[in-house]
Amino acid sequence: MGAEKRINDEEAQPLTGRDRSRDSIDSTSTASISLALIDQANRSTHAGRTTPPRNFGNGEKYRDNDDDNPEGGLPPPSGAQRTPKKVSIIFWLVAALCVGGWLVAFFVFMGSPKKDSDKEVVVSGAENSTVPGVVSTGGKKVDLDGVLTGFWSPRSHEISWIPGPDGEDGLLLEQDGDENAGYLRVENIRNQKSTNKKDDAVVLMKRETFKVGARRVRPSKVWPSPDLKTVLVMSDRLKNWRHSYTGNYWLFNVETQTGEPLDPGSPDGRIQLASWSPKSDSVVFTRDNNMFIRNLSSKDVKPITTDGGVNLFYGIPDWVYEEEVFSGNSATWWDNDGKFVAFLRTNESRVPEYPVQYFIPTVGRVAHAGEEHYPNTRKIKYPKAGAPNPTVNIQFFDVEKGEVFSIEMEDDLPDHDRLIIEVIWASNGKVLVRETNRESDRLSMVLVDAKDRTAKVIRSQDFSKLDGGWIEPSQSTYFIPADPGNGRPHDGYIETVPFEGFNHLAYFTPLDNPSPVFLTSGNWEVTDAPSAVDLKRGLVYFVAAKEQPTERHVYTVRLDGSDLQPIVNTKAPAYYTISLSTGAGYALLKYEGPEIPWQKVISTPANEERFEETIENNTELAGRAKDYALPSLYYQTITIDGYTLPVVERRPPNFNPDKKYPVLFHLYGGPGSQTVSKRFKVDFQSYVASNLGYIVVTVDGRGTGFIGRKARCVVRDNLGHYEAIDQIETAKAWGKRPYVDATRMAIWGWSYGGFMTLKTLERDAGQTFQYGMAVAPVTDWQFYDSIYTERYMHTPQNNPAGYANTAVSNVTALGQTVRFMVIHGTGDDNVHYQNTLTLLDKLDVDNVGNFDVHVYPDSDHGIYFHNAYKMLHERLSDWLVNAFNGEWVKIRNPVPNKSLMRRARSLLKRMSNA
């Protein structure tokens, strides 16, 4: 699932400001009408003498982070005239009755009994992560332009580590515009400190462009061959889905500095994927959903498959596998010897289509003559929950024999109930295939022998019996080859598996051994691990949330599970990531917060040759942090029903504990996700705190990641239930704080966060949160894709009650909030616009009207099309300001001013005659 550039430094004027002299339906509150009545009475009593009205719109803009007028009182009327005592008493009596009635109703609304009041809630800690040099209380306010245009994004460098042709370690691929040194070159990390970039560099491409016939080719992406003699080049890249694209592909000869088409017979063909043989002698690629192979010794291209098309995919994933399983565009795997290619065959024949309509003419959307003014419709094979899934099988191509074959296995999952989530080549023609059932709670590890053409299940696990949870797809299983002389008599693999309630590293050896050696254990979790393995020294490198769920540090452990050691400082709060060289002797170490991020290239502890070089310290960003008034971050935990959950509170600069601040809750909350972390980040939430002066709180509730499987798995079959309770209980706890205005609380989120916003408002029914903003929300999980949804909900056929509970259906409860807003892009191929339309229909049926909706034509899930991203955030900001300024309270029950005035005058007349 999936998201987050102009408004000026001053807060926008309330959107509901109107000319009070208009004879129309107005949004004026009862209290405002009472004051207006008094002014009218004054004017009528003193015929011919005008009393200026109160200055409701004097051009000054209210800010919650300004302390000039803590009471927020209205200025006195100018030039007020005296009124006869009897009339004044009557008028003031009427005004008092009106105001009193309004206040009574308001406090009854705010003080009504709360749901879930019996919950055990404990808030712990108030650690201020603010450190000198990162957060300043003075300076300029964070503006929206800066947040949305990358002004606050840390500079970051990626290193493409590559193995040397002879096994050299510490080699990296450099690609830049320095044609003096060479556009594309391989450098030894040891020479990075040299002022002469040509030192020991192997130049692969001298210039950025090259000619093939009359055509000039400019690379979009490049992949050097393992022997570094040829470069596979993609040009003219066109995006498909989130991770996939097509392009024209070329082979560039390093020695001659010349290029040729990958397929000389079809140089303009749009290729979907291409990958090198480990021997550098051939390339396999997919075009028009069929696979081909080109041997470099010939210009001939040979087909591997021929029946690919609209419903059959070879070597690439379809939409749902790209989005929910592989998180990438490849379903092709070469074996280590270059003798076999494994690839996914995907059959979508039974998968229903979903039409995504595009209404705005743009470049690239070609219409037939006479159809230019009709929407363009793209039909996607999209399996919704409970609908038929694509059927997937692993097939193999024998490179030497030129034949495709499949391997049957006894006790395999049936086609309709099989997900293939990972493929890992071992040695000697053996391959590991991780499979799960459709509902992702039964795992099978299959060992396939491509040489003998046999297959067997070597390990299985039922997660529904283990802890009621599920298997998340990942691509991090690591093959460990046998090395008898180094204490490894058999092949094996490392996988992240559940152990005593937390995700840990397990080493399985031999390959068919179902009982592993656990390399890590404890009440903490490893993340997408291992990062790398030093096979010579038997060291496993991994990243873990060991010190705190909100932090990441880097560790090593030996293959026997001994000597777990950090390689970074674990005493200070930090969030690290790491990318290791192919031999694990060097690493790109990234420090991502909470202070200003930096990057270093280092030698790893086992490397006897010491090396360290800072390649980015973000000096410019550090200067900006000093010049701007950034919010202060307070990391805490809250315990709800025995579950300890991480919370971060963003306080405005110059925070005044004697003031009452509005609070905005921001959340995502999807299963296994994490929003509360100690990364340095200046985002929309930072803008809200710094510029608008509101407190922003985020709590990672039950179901989120790195707090243990018990807290994570409790949400299964009932998404949105416990997560909503956690948001509400946290908001109640914050509402009791002396510096929080509990009458001004809002919540917002995008995607799963949009769903959670609506579910929280639905459960809360206006008792805690008065406002909400939901962007691209799921409103019924039967509308979302099968693989993601059924992992957490089972199928609708097996869990009908759960799906009914998770749908946003109690719109009457939504009607009890002051106001909420829903935003969606009509071209969303991920969370379909159908979700919002269905919710709007439910609101219409139940006559609920306290909401706003904004639709962005042709925008997908990221909402970028035609300035949409910038406008969306401006809309969120303006809407929130109006909410916390009380504008939406004023328009809850609009009454024509003229009618109300007439009734008031009639009442006054009767009172005068009494």
UniProtKB/Swiss-Prot annotation:
Q: Which Gene3D superfamilies match?
A: alpha/beta hydrolase, Dipeptidylpeptidase IV, N-terminal domain
Glycosites: N128, N295, N347, N617, N810, N897
Topological domains annotated Cytoplasmic: 1-88
Spell out the catalytic residues: S751 (charge relay system), D828 (charge relay system), H861 (charge relay system)
| SUPFAM superfamilies in the record | alpha/beta-Hydrolases, DPP6 N-terminal domain-like
Q: Which keywords belong to this entry?
A: Aminopeptidase, Glycoprotein, Hydrolase, Membrane, Protease, Serine protease, Signal-anchor, Transmembrane, Transmembrane helix, Vacuole
**Membrane topology of this protein:** Single-pass type II membrane protein
**Name of one Pfam family that matches:** DPPIV_N
Instruction: Give the Enzyme Commission number.
Output: 3.4.14.5
Disulfide links within the chain = none
**Which GO molecular-function terms appear in the entry?**
aminopeptidase activity; dipeptidyl-peptidase activity; serine-type peptidase activity
- UniProt GO cellular component terms: fungal-type vacuole membrane; plasma membrane
Q: Tell me if Glycoprotein is a UniProt keyword of this record.
A: yes
Q: Which InterPro entries match?
A: AB_hydrolase_fold (IPR029058), Peptidase_S9_cat (IPR001375), Peptidase_S9B_N (IPR002469), Serine_Prot_S9B/DPPIV (IPR050278)
Question: So what does this thing catalyse?
Answer: Release of an N-terminal dipeptide, Xaa-Yaa-|-Zaa-, from a polypeptide, preferentially when Yaa is Pro, provided Zaa is neither Pro nor hydroxyproline
Vacuolar side: which ranges?
110-914
* TM region(s), chain numbering: 89-109
Q: Where in the cell is it found?
A: Vacuole membrane
The kind of enzyme this is, by top-level EC class, is hydrolase
**Domain of life the protein comes from:** Eukaryota
Which residue ranges are recorded for the region named Disordered?
Answer: 1-82
Q: Which GO terms describe its biological process?
A: proteolysis
Q: Where are the compositionally biased (Low complexity) regions?
A: 26-38
Q: Which family does it belong to?
A: Belongs to the peptidase S9B family.
Task: Tell me the function of this protein.
Answer: Type IV dipeptidyl-peptidase which removes N-terminal dipeptides sequentially from polypeptides having unsubstituted N-termini provided that the penultimate residue is proline.
The protein here is known as: Probable dipeptidyl-aminopeptidase B
Q: What is the lineage of its organism?
A: Eukaryota, Fungi, Dikarya, Ascomycota, Pezizomycotina
The protein's gene is named: DAPB
